[in-house]
Amino acid sequence: MNFRRRFIQLPLAAAVLTLGAASAWAQGVTLLNVSYDPTRELYVEFNQAFAKHWKAQTGQDLTIKQSHGGSGKQARSIIDGLEADVATLALAGDTDALHTNGGWIPKDWQKRLPHNSAPYTSTIVLVVRQGNPKGIKDWDDLVRPGISVITPNPKTSGGARWNYLAAWEFAKRKYGGDAKAKDFVTRLYANVPVLDTGARGSSVTFAQRNQGDVFISWENEAYLLEKEFGSKVDVVYPSLSILAEPAVTVVDKNVDKKGTRAVAEAYLKYLYTEEGQDIVGRHFYRPAISEKAKAKYAKQFPALQLFTIDAAFGGWEKAAKDHFADHASFDQIYIKK
């Protein structure tokens, strides 16, 4: 009798669970993408495209929320409890921090997706006032007396770290050795009147507040500025710059807690599709995977001599220790205004 009662109850319980699951599925799912400053416009369009794709594939409604700021600050926010499903930060070093500070992701996170989990690349360029009145052509023009340089704080901004290292390597190659490079960036940052926390803040400082003669910028941000303020700014490509490789990952602890792993993984994989790569190119990032997208957008990216973080600085772990840790080179050269 007890057996029969339990036997009857089990299907009822299963039915309740099934209805509950169906109800939850019908209510949809929400993802949070925690990213760095200049990806706002990219992910607005990409999120719309992926949500449409996900609905067509699964029938489930998807809401994607975005959080943007300096890459280092964004990484710290995740470590401190911001429940990101995916992190699309400015550099692998910031993403590595999610492993070393709390095990939010596995150590080998970069091996989970093609191209070291970097579906797009970028570089660092110079944005000047229209007509280039100060005659800025290369990195060494930024250390001239009287030149005002806008760049964010490498303590909080991933883009600022790319900026700093690009200038350092230029000087190291041109003038010979790290000592000369350190002197060069010391003089460069003496020309920086203010350090914003992120790249978009520096963009606003330069373009809207009209501070500075030159803005050291992500390539995509430079073209967005040119698109919005075309009559006010010009883009200058230096003789040498760095290959910036923003990387992406699911935040394992959060997706497993929230039950969003499947959709989060599909979201990142969609960046590698033809549609994803085309959206990347439309927003002035360099497609890393699709040959079709590379060819389509090749003309908007002038030829440029690029070096990698691994070849020049031994990777992000070493670069962070040598240049951006407490009391490392940036702390030594920067004098607060």
Please tell me what each predicted stretch does:
Residues 1-14, 22:
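Twin-arginine (Tat) signal peptide motif
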Residues 27-156, 335:
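N-terminal segment of the mature folded domain
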Residues 34-36, 128-130, 148-174, 188-192, ...:
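Short beta-strand->loop
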Residues 38-42, 46, 74, 90-94, ...:
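Stable alpha-helical elements in mature extracytoplasmic
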Residues 47-56, 79-83, 92, 99-103, ...:
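Sec-exported extracytoplasmic/periplasmic mature domains
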Residues 131-137, 156, 169-177, 254-262:
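Short helix-loop capping/hinge motifs at secondary-structure junctions, enriched
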Residues 173-240:
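Ligand-binding pocket segment of bilobal, Venus flytrap-like solute-binding proteins
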Residues 255-337:
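Extracellular/periplasmic juxtamembrane helices and adjacent flexible linkers that interface
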